Amino acid sequence: MINEDKIKVAVIGCGFFATNHILSWKNFKDVDLVGVCDLDEERAINASHLAKGTPYFTDAELMLKEVRPDVVDIVTTAPSHYNLAKLAASLNISAIIQKPLAPSLKESTKIVDLAETTQTPMMVHENFRFQQPLRTLQKIILNGEIGQLLFCKISFRTSYDVYRQQPYL
C-alpha cells in the first residue's frame, strides 16, 4: 500500500550494491520503495523479495511510467548512467546516481548539463560520507586537532563493520 505522504523511490539496478540501497530505503519511515528494476529478471525478482514484495520490472521506462516515483536510485554500471538519467529527466523524476557518475569527464558533464537544462535534481551517491569513523575524522580535522591540513589521502580499509548500525545512503 502506497502512502502519498511518503517519498516514493524506485531502484534501477539490482546487483551487489543495490542490496544495501534497497535495505536502506526500506528502513526509512518516510519512504515507500515502489519498484525495483534490472535487465536480469532473476536479479529483479530477488530484489523484490529482499524488498518484501516491492513490484519488480525488467524495463526501466515501464517501471518509471507505471510507479511514478519522486526519486529514482540508479545503481547500475557507469556506462548506463547517462541514458537512465536522461530517462528520469524526461519524466521529471529526480535521480540519485551511483558513483562514478559516468565513465568519462565528457559524459559526466553531459549529465550535469542535462540536470541544469531540465532543472531535474540529480545527485551522486556517496555512501560512506556519514559513516562514524569518517565523521570522527572530520571532527578531528575541523577542530584543528592535527594542525592545518595541507594534503590528505585516505584509504578506508578496516575490520570495523561499516554496514552494521550505520547509514548507507
Please place each PLM-identified region on the residue numbering.
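N-terminal Rossmann-like dinucleotide-binding module
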Residues: M1-A51
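Short, Asp-centered acidic motifs that coordinate Mg2+ and/or phosphate
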Residues: G35, D70-V71, F151
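Beta-loop-alpha module in the N-terminal Rossmann-like domain of NAD(P)-dependent dehydrogenases
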Residues: P55-L114
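Rossmann-fold dehydrogenase core element
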Residues: K110-N127, G147-C152
